[in-house]
Amino acid sequence: MSALHKLKAYFGMVPADEIDEVYDDEVAYRDRYADPDTSYDAPSDRVGGRRRVAGGVRGGFQPEAEEDGGDYGEEFREPARSRRQWAPPETPVRAPLGSDAHREQVSRLRAVTDTGSHFNLSKITTLHPRSYSEARTIGEQYRDGTPVIMNLTEMDEADAKRLVDFAAGLAFALRGSIEKVTNRVFLLSPPNVDVAAEDKRRLAEGAFFNYG
């Protein structure tokens, strides 16, 4: 069949029986000149390495599990993280305010306070020095832990001032205290003795001065 006749058959310009003849000629030509190693497969339903979803594209193309080497059919689960057991910090247990420990502490504080406020005034040594040479006696009494009252009314101004300086240094060295009770009368208290204000007032009145 000539090429012109085939062109007419392509545009429907020949009878129907001649069209079948044209088709048979094409099949015979293909069988004659086709490569025996060439195989014509049916069109694949894969596009770009992806499988087309039946019934149209829904949500795009879905990758095949075989190509990626993974199985998307199984649900991916993140491995469970180990949870550290929380423990409350160790705190010391405090006794309530009404416990015996609190009462014992308050009792101790009161005992110390009472000891200082009710100091026995009869244990206080009262000295009436007439010269600076009697400073040694004052130092020995105070060093033994005895409160000392210095009555400097019988001393001249210069010696009285020197004796006050000596007593102040003595109290500082032994971590005690020196206080002025009244004019030219001083009280030297050891570090473990606290004379109450009422007792100081009585000392100032001269009730416990020993002139013997």
Swiss-Prot record:
One of its GO terms (cellular component) is cytoplasm. Residues 64-73 have a biased composition (Acidic residues). InterPro entries: Cell_div_SepF, Cell_div_SepF/SepF-rel, SepF-like_sf. Belongs to the SepF family. It comes from the Bacteria. Its main location: cytoplasm. Homodimer. Interacts with FtsZ. Cell division protein that is part of the divisome complex and is recruited early to the Z-ring. Probably stimulates Z-ring formation, perhaps through the cross-linking of FtsZ protofilaments. Its function overlaps with FtsA. This is Cell division protein SepF. Keywords: Cell cycle, Cell division, Cytoplasm, Septation. Residues 32-104 are annotated as: Disordered.
